[in-house]
Amino acid sequence: MGELAKEILPVNIEDELKQSYLDYAMSVIVGRALPDARDGLKPVHRRVLYAMSELGNDWNKPYKKSARVVGDVIGKYHPHGDTAVYDTIVRMAQPFSLRYMLVDGQGNFGSVDGDNAAAMRYTEVRMAKLAHELLADLEKETVDWVPNYDGTEQIPAVMPTKIPNLLVNGSSGIAVGMATNIPPHNLGEVIDGCLALMDNPDLTVDELMQYIPGPDFPTAGIINGRAGIIEAYRTGRGRIYIRARAVVEEMEKGGGREQIIITELPYQLNKARLIEKIAELVKEKKIEGISELRDESDKDGMRVVIELRRGEVGEVVLNNLYAQTQLQSVFGINVVALVDGQPRTLNLKDMLEVFVRHRREVVTRRTVYELRKARERGHILEGQAVALSNIDPVIELIKSSPTPAEAKERLIATAWESSAVEAMVERAGADACRPEDLDPQYGLRDGKYYLSPEQAQAILELRLHRLTGLEHEKLLSEYQEILNLIGELIRILTNPARLMEVIREELEAVKAEFGDARRTEIVASQVDLTIADLITEEDRVVTISHGGYAKSQPLAAYQAQRRGGKGKSATGMKDEDYIEHLLVANSHATLLLFSSKGKVYWLRTFEIPEASRTARGRPLVNLLPLDEGERITAMLQIDLEALQQNGGADDDLDEAEGAVLEGEVVEAAEVEEVEGETAELVAEPTGAYIFMATAFGTVKKTPLVQFSRPRSSGLIALKLEEGDTLIAAAITDGAKEVMLFSSAGKVIRFAESVVRIMGRNARGVRGMRLGKGQQLISMLIPESGAQILTASERGFGKRTPLSKFPRRGRGGQGVIAMVTNERNGALIAAVQVQEGEEIMLISDQGTLVRTRVDEVSLSGRNTQGVTLIKLASDEVLVGLERVQEPSGGDDEDLPEGEEAAESLGESAESESEPAAEAEGNEE
């Protein structure tokens, strides 16, 4: 080794690795992976287009074999594998890959299904017409040239493009330590942005977005939301969500069934793989409701048909497809391109400025080139015009010269008469056609014209037919045109405004010829898929057991039964657990769950897991952050979204006028009461409130808006005395009436307005005075014409007209609502009902009965009622809930067998008891 090396230098291996890797990285970055910000092309694209141009493979000429182009590219300009070059050509010829194709292909160039292109020996290509705009004026010294890999050829360092190709067709690539991913855009919109920036260089990115609203993909689709676009245009980085275009329509012969039609896909999505993925999800039952899936795409366009089963909601299935497949996909924008040979992250304005600056340089260099050529041509014409005006002496001089060289020297040495061109030269300027490097001794001087060597040579080469008078006139006319052209070129070079005008005219011409309509729709506000979008909207029965287990079931799972029926088991009870709360709620509704400790929690109905009738459900502690010993005591259904839109989400309104801030219970003595009426009602503004009642008889009214901002850890709804619990809550408007029922069968009815508005931290005021061992069991907000249905723990109940319940002042003991004795047991619930409605009854052993209100006898307050549900000796009734159905009677659905007979028999037995219908003292 010592004989071969002149000198050996010790090098630290870490330093050498750093330098060598840096050299390699920069080679990949500059020479392979990143596009130039000026023409938007990577080296391989630039070399392919240049090779096709050199081959004369123009848009208006016959196709050439792809292999021919690939061979020229790898042989002259791109020393890499033929596969990489051919893949580049294929991509530039695919209408689903490039927004504006640069190569016109003939043959199989692949498909959106991921099919590969045919081998290069089978396909043919030529440049697309648009590609010529990238190479326009290349021969006019508009760009720098660099040697190819072996120094035998010269190739352009950048294309003199008239098209802002970086934005128009985008680019993607992975370099060392960096990557780029630029989406395509609409040509007309990008040119409009360029023109606007040329008119006002101070435009901001946001102002430029008025002209360039967002990417425009070749496969169309829908961009979901503008936030990602704005971020990417401002910073060069962002994420946009692209959705397929799909519609839900009713099948022509489907008997009411729906089908989903997909006509556009997100950019770069493989259609065949998408269909396979959907089929896989259906097979795994991750997406339900799809009965058939087929691809009906043809030469006229894309069409994927998804047929649904009867009863399935198309929008819900489509939302599930968006969530679980690439029908909605993310395009990560990362605008990294080479500027002055260095990688830079560019925002929207940066990209447009780089292109406009490039066009200014190209047009300037082209104008300088054209001016030089025009002056050279004008100089020759000037000499020929002088010769023609002195034709006889010139011919005589040439005839008398022994050799062409001597004739040339004598032509140069002679001073010629120049009257034919002198006037034109004076008008255009003495130096108008004078080449910059021409010796001062030549040209017009002292009234005579001295020919240059170039002019003398042109005269010697002049053909005889040019000596005719007509040709003489043509020559002078051409000379005048050259002078005019030179004047225009000089104006372009000396007047920046005229230079920008030329650039504008060329951009407008490109837009007029190649501009087209936008394909991709942009949805202004992002439509985020939430869990609610994936859930079919339906009424559900939500139950919470005494042991703290929650579940939901479709309301349709229960059929109406006759009064006294044994019913269906609503849940599987273990360890003597029983259903304590039941609510019929929409699957998309928000539930306010009030706990025994005075806190409120938020849950969407669909967040409560669905379970069968015999299943126990899921522990509430897995759904809510409940403390030890804390249990849910009330549920309330609200439209949270509407509440937030209409009322905002003020955290605390405790300082509102009239609010009770102290944590003490306000005694009833504060309100003067008279027999049956309240002496004075406090005037309050109308609005939405939550009216709450506790087991100790305390009530409180708080603005609903204070519960419109969900907290994951819950929120204090009211402060409680030790041992007290919340038993009911309802939404009111501030002008309703309130009815409180106690376990002793008593009820008190008073105006809501006597209860002042209070903040969340207040304890409330006395609503009903209770005896020892008694507690509130129900609170109702009565409606006009309603009837009150009460039920006792032994399964007896009755209906009583609302008019039978007198109004009393807040804080009293109330009047009898239902007789409580050994037969009936304590009062467990009261609900208000209307004719034609249904109720649900639940026992502590999980038995559930759904029956019509009409089958419960209508009677006065001081009565015992009739049998509502047949209970075992060790079974008690614990729940009563009103069920409201949208429409239609269910008479035909009522069971007519054993349960019906049994319920009718029970009814007769109950009504035969004298005590059941005996009227007593209404007080």
Swiss-Prot record:
GO biological process per UniProt: DNA topological change; DNA-templated DNA replication
Sequence motif GyrA-box, location on chain: 561-567
Coiled-coil intervals: none
Keywords attached to this entry: ATP-binding, Cytoplasm, DNA-binding, Isomerase, Nucleotide-binding, Topoisomerase
Highest taxon in the source lineage: Bacteria
Reaction equation(s) it catalyzes: ATP-dependent breakage, passage and rejoining of double-stranded DNA
Acidic residues biased stretches: 888-901, 908-923
Gene Ontology cellular component list: chromosome; cytoplasm; DNA topoisomerase type II (double strand cut, ATP-hydrolyzing) complex
Region named Disordered: 881-923
Miscellaneous: Few gyrases are as efficient as E.coli at forming negative supercoils. Not all organisms have 2 type II topoisomerases; in organisms with a single type II topoisomerase this enzyme also has to decatenate newly replicated chromosomes.
PANTHER family listed in its UniProt record: DNA GYRASE SUBUNIT A, CHLOROPLASTIC_MITOCHONDRIAL, DNA GYRASE/TOPOISOMERASE SUBUNIT A
Protein family membership: Belongs to the type II topoisomerase GyrA/ParC subunit family.
Subunit structure: Heterotetramer, composed of two GyrA and two GyrB chains. In the heterotetramer, GyrA contains the active site tyrosine that forms a transient covalent intermediate with DNA, while GyrB binds cofactors and catalyzes ATP hydrolysis.
Protein's recorded name: DNA gyrase subunit A
Species assigned in the record: Pseudomonas aeruginosa (strain ATCC 15692 / DSM 22644 / CIP 104116 / JCM 14847 / LMG 12228 / 1C / PRS 101 / PAO1)
